[in-house]
Amino acid sequence: MKNIIFVFLSVILFLCCSSDNDAIIINEPVKIPERSIVLAEQATKSIVIIDADTYQKVWSWDAAKSGVPTERQIWFSNPSEVKPVYNGKYILMTASGGAVALIRIVDSKLMYYAQAGSNPHSAELLPDGNIVAVSSTDTKLRTFVTDTIKGFGKFYASYEFPSAHNVVWDKKRNLLYTTQDRKLYSFTYNNDSKAPQLLDKTLVMELPNTESCGHDLFPVQDKENSLWLTTNENIWQYNLETNKLEKIYPFYAVKSVSDSKDGILMLYPTTQWWSDGLINEKGKKLFTIPGAKIYKGRWMQDNTFSYPENHPFKLGK
């Protein structure tokens, strides 16, 4: 993102999920710096944005303060994915409690959410704004019609997919990628906004048998044809154009990797599956948030591998 985004911390007085006009908001101006990082923070069940220079929190969101019915708030426990989307003005998230959600940063409004299965690990935007999510415990890929008028929905189609942990859209090739253990697969999309379906499952490549459990899959920022892929053993880059697979770092069980011109961020778990800070490519801890249980961290920047450079959000279904 080239410009400083002005956002507002919000006090939501009424339910904020059914339309753009049904929330009364008291705004307090806050600046999100150009260099910032978004975190999936499980200790507070929240999404947090921090300043990348000071590592101070500048924005946060949690379901309990966002009009989510009490009985559904458990869906948002243990946030497991955070992706800046729509030119960094929204966050696409999942939580291991079951949620997939789209959040608008400017007023912290929950634009859309749904139950995405047992232990969702990641989600992705499709070209028409619909969503696909992956859940690892019930081993499913699911598509969702993103109805931001109602603000809440259910999955449209479900596909059996063991070891489902990640999902990335490739706008150049019009393909969706996801890993099944050591194997990277692609799907095509039927581009039906009212009936979204994934088609043509195809094996793209297979990691060496020394690897296990493909975890994070994410575009390499400065290489238009390459993807990061973390496993239980190493961190890799795969070039879709040349079919070249390269081992980059010998870090094991990394939950997320994200690079920018300012460096590389990785979540290396130090306690069970989380840590209280991120590390760089040299293994140096960049910051510590006392008491935090961070599961993923990503640079707040445009992802032009997956989305158009100018990617406006459209209200609707």
Model segments located where?
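A short beta-strand motif characteristic of beta-propeller blades
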Residues: 57-73, 108-114, 151-159, 200-209, ...
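Residue-level detector of Asp-centered blade-edge/turn motifs that repeat once per structural unit
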Residues: 32-33, 85-88, 126-128, 171-173, ...
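Bacterial Sec-dependent N-terminal signal peptides
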Residues: 14-32
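Blade-loop segments of beta-propeller domains
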Residues: 61-101, 105-124
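Conserved beta-strand positions in repeat-built beta-propeller and related beta-rich domains
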Residues: 39-43, 51, 85, 92-97, ...
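Repeated scaffold domains used in trafficking and secretory/extracellular systems
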Residues: 70-83, 117-126, 162-169, 209-220, ...
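Loop/turn-rich, solvent-exposed surfaces of beta-rich toroidal or solenoidal domains
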Residues: 211-280
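Short loop/turn segments immediately following beta-strands, especially the blade-tip
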Residues: 52-57, 145-150, 188-197, 240-246
